[in-house]
Amino acid sequence: MRTSPRMKWFVLLFTFVFAIGMNSFRNSFQFFMLPMADAFHADRSLISVSVSIFMITTGIVQFFVGFFIDRFSVRKIMALGAVCISASFLVLPYSPNVHVFSAIYGVLGGIGYSCAVGVTTQYFISCWFDTHKGLALAILTNANSAGLLLLSPIWAAAPYHAGWQSTYTILGIVMAAVLLPLLVFGMKHPPHAQAETVKKSYDWRGFWNVMKQSRLIHILYFGVFTCGFTMGIIDAHLVPILKDAHVSHVNGMMAAFGAFIIIGGLLAGWLSDLLGSRSVMLSILFFIRLLSLICLLIPILGIHHSDLWYFGFILLFGLSYTGVIPLTAASISESYQTGLIGSLLGINFFIHQVAGALSVYAGGLFFDMTHGYLLIVAVCIVFVGLSAVIELVPFLDKQKAKETHHSI
């Protein structure tokens, strides 16, 4: 079946809008966190459990979604995800307590999110684009950030004007009445299906050799753990951090954060190609993230109180936010045999999500213990500093190997 050359760009636009809607499920949480905690008479560590469960669920489910795509229609999997997200939004307001809320948000919402976006949308767009594939995927990746940029003012105002329960109900209706039809009628099936099938045998020996002996994979996985740990705490606790510090224009800060995430994500891929080294770019990203955390640490320690420190954090953390995952994935795909890449990427995503889940809960727990975020920020600084250094090791190894080769 032949389609208009313009059709793929319309499909990308519809998928972009679809992804913004699905990402609203997790992006809106931090804006509703404090009102929800008050409604359930829960502290921050307890309400944060829902996000931890969500991140663990998505980490596990995304590992298997790629295999399901090869057996079932990707659009059916995305539709299942959209139904689960819509159902979660509609049921959550009727949760009798925080434990039921956490189970619904974390498990049902996590399954829905994993099926609706991520591996599925990337696969879907890859099937549509034979050319301009890199640009298309880069645009799609920024749907989450665009949603944060565009919708932050709504998320900030909604729980205090309409209430979080009514807001969730409205979102559930929008998912079912707008985004599901958009998927069915706008996001058409790709003109040609992927011919590849799941391998019947798996190279377990090669897999375990890589896991046990490859220093590169250990370094990349540590970096991904650091990325997930620092992103998790910021995704769930940034708005409470800013409000506790009485920062003015929190809504504007969050919108700017989304803009910096988009800019940083696009720049990271371009610069890594320009530098010719994923490792160097990863190190640079972690160094930028280290500077951002230092900006956050200064007002927390009481050294100097100014909104500019928080803006500096928003700027630098935003620029380093999305680059680590795609560059790590690129490094894995360029360094290991094809038959192992899917599993290695699945573990990569799982580590990222588990690290995020740990930090979300730890951030709430440390706050309840110390009434501040100093301890969790200090832990993040240690992880990021280590990652900024060790990500350079593969680059230095290559330079050393080149020098040895030339000397011979």
From Swiss-Prot:
Xref: InterPro entries: MFS, MFS_dom, MFS_trans_sf, Proton-linked_MCT
Family matches, as SUPFAM superfamilies: MFS general substrate transporter
Keyword Cytoplasm annotated: no
PANTHER family hit by this protein: EG:103B4.3 PROTEIN-RELATED, MONOCARBOXYLATE TRANSPORTER
Record localization: Cell membrane
A cellular component term, taken from the record's GO annotations: plasma membrane
UniProt family annotation: Belongs to the major facilitator superfamily.
Transmembrane residue ranges: 9-29, 49-69, 77-97, 100-120, 135-155, 167-187, 216-236, 252-272, 283-303, 308-328, 340-360, 373-393
A Pfam family: MFS_1
Gene name in the database record: ycxA
PROSITE patterns to which the protein is assigned, alphabetical: MFS (PS50850)
Domain of life: Bacteria
Source organism: Bacillus subtilis (strain 168)
GO molecular function: transmembrane transporter activity
Keywords: Cell membrane, Membrane, Transmembrane, Transmembrane helix, Transport
Keyword Signal: no
Name of the protein: Uncharacterized MFS-type transporter YcxA
